[in-house]
């Protein structure tokens, strides 16, 4: 798995909405998951240290994946278990690509682009994990922190010849229902599509 220099990744980073038919490998997905929510150590209080900064090490996010095309992995909905660095298969979803069109509101500037990616990352947040410490300020911190996560997805994708595109406009109710989130205590806050770049 070749990796570009950090300088090149930052300079070449663009939102990518056109993907090739090539699939991501499991090794590449593993790398992207590590880059966005991977654990790099523990502090003296037993809190996880990760590849992204997070206010007070509260880590309010969970990573769900809608996998369309990935080498050696069946299509479906998965959850990333960061402590174990493992994927948990949740369930298959009938008409997954059509559901992704509906979730992403069939973005008019590039129709159906998300369904053509290899994988759609969906980050959920459980605000209370930060609210107990920061009260109402937690909401601002959560929004900043999810930006760190998605930027790492962009840079890590770039480093392996893939491209990412963040998606901030989506059908909130539908995606929360699909992932069996209550939409109150836990809800999706950001999406990111990733696929191999088209030449």
Task: Briefly describe each language-model feature range.
Residues 14-23, 132-143, 160:
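Short histidine-centered catalytic/ligand-binding loop motif
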Residues 88, 92, 187-199:
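C-terminal helix-cap and adjacent tail motif
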Residues 77-79, 120-122, 191-193:
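Conserved hydrophobic/aromatic beta-strand scaffold that supports enzyme active sites
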Residues 177-184:
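Short proline/glycine-enriched turn/loop segments at secondary-structure junctions
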């Amino acid at each position: 798995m070749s990796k570009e220099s950090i300088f090149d990744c930052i300079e070449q980073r663009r939102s990518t909405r056109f993907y090739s038919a090539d699939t991501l490998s499991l090794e590449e997905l593993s790398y992207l998951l590590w880059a966005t929510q991977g654990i790099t150590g523990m502090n003296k209080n037993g809190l996880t240290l990760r590849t992204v900064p997070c206010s007070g090490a509260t880590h309010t996010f969970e990573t769900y994946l809608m996998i369309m095309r990935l080498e050696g992995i069946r299509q479906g909905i998965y959850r990333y278990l960061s402590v174990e660095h493992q994927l948990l298969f949740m369930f298959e979803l009938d008409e997954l690509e059509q559901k992704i069109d509906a979730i992403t509101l069939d973005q008019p500037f590039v129709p159906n682009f998300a369904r053509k990616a290899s994988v759609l990352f969906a980050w959920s947040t459980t605000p209370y994990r930060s609210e107990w410490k920061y009260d109402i300020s937690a909401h601002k911190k959560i929004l900043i922190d999810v930006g760190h996560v998605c930027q790492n997805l962009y840079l890590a994708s770039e480093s392996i010849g893939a491209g990412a595109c963040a998606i901030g406009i989506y059908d909130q109710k539908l995606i929360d229902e699909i992932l069996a989130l209550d939409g109150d205590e836990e809800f999706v806050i950001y999406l990111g599509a990733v696929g191999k770049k088209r030449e």
